[in-house]
A protein has these predicted regions:
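Short beta-rich binding modules
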Residues: 1-219
Length: 219
């Protein structure tokens, strides 16, 4: 009645765990938490994005959008805009309380907690490109969110905004990741740290005035 399927048997051993290799993944967003940090320098704002792929491998990315001194993190804001484009959403909506799962280091298991979340993101599929990074304070490299793309089409945010229909940029990104799957950000690294992003080509046409931006969104 049942027969051995070699691929299924191999996949069984690969299920679960965490994303721990550089590459591209199609993931489902489990939670998008509005994470606020408070310290002596002030308040910082972050998007804590928890994702899972079809093999049940998980990853969590912190995207800082505002430093504790109140200065906006332009790189983080660009990343959030790219995610919105790849999800075909105009905005994240306001954070609202929602139940999410978080790992408790003391009990060493996941627990249900209430957090302020951007629930528009929850359950949506997203393409991500991961580059592994070795950072101070961590024994092993951890996944770094290098780029995002639309899960269904493999179009990048820029291609979506230009209303293009054929993905071209993702292949270039993956060629770069194949060449640099791991970067070492440690201060006492034995090798000089590598840049985490490729220089991006400048747009051929000037950016639209602020008041026209929303009307130019092609979705």
């Amino acid at each position: 009645m049942y027969k051995l399927n070699k691929q299924d048997a191999i996949a069984y051993d690969q299920r679960g765990g965490y994303i721990n290799q550089a590459g591209k993944y199609v993931v489902t967003i489990e939670s998008a938490v509005f994470h606020v940090g408070n310290n002596a320098n002030g308040r910082s704002e972050n998007l804590k994005l928890s994702v899972i792929d079809n093999q049940k491998r998980k990853a969590t990315f912190f995207i800082n959008t505002s430093y504790s001194n109140g200065v906006q993190n332009e790189g983080g804001l660009r990343t959030v805009s790219a995610i919105l484009a790849c999800l075909r959403e105009h905005d994240s909506g306001e954070p609202t309380p929602a139940q999410v799962k978080e790992y408790n280091r003391e009990t060493q298991q996941e627990e249900a907690v209430m957090r302020d979340c951007f629930t528009k993101f929850h359950g949506k599929q997203l393409g991500i490109v991961v580059q592994m990074a070795h950072e101070d304070g961590r024994e092993n490299p951890s996944p770094n969110l290098y780029s995002v793309f639309e899960a269904s089409s493999e179009l990048t945010a820029g291609e979506i905004m230009r209303a293009e229909t054929r993905p071209a940029q993702l292949g270039k990104i993956m060629a770069y990741i194949a060449n640099k799957p791991l970067i070492d950000k440690r201060k006492n690294s034995p090798v000089p740290p590598q840049p985490t992003r490729q220089p991006m080509p400048q747009p051929a046409t000037p950016a639209a005035p602020v008041e026209d931006i929303d009307s130019d969104i092609p979705f």
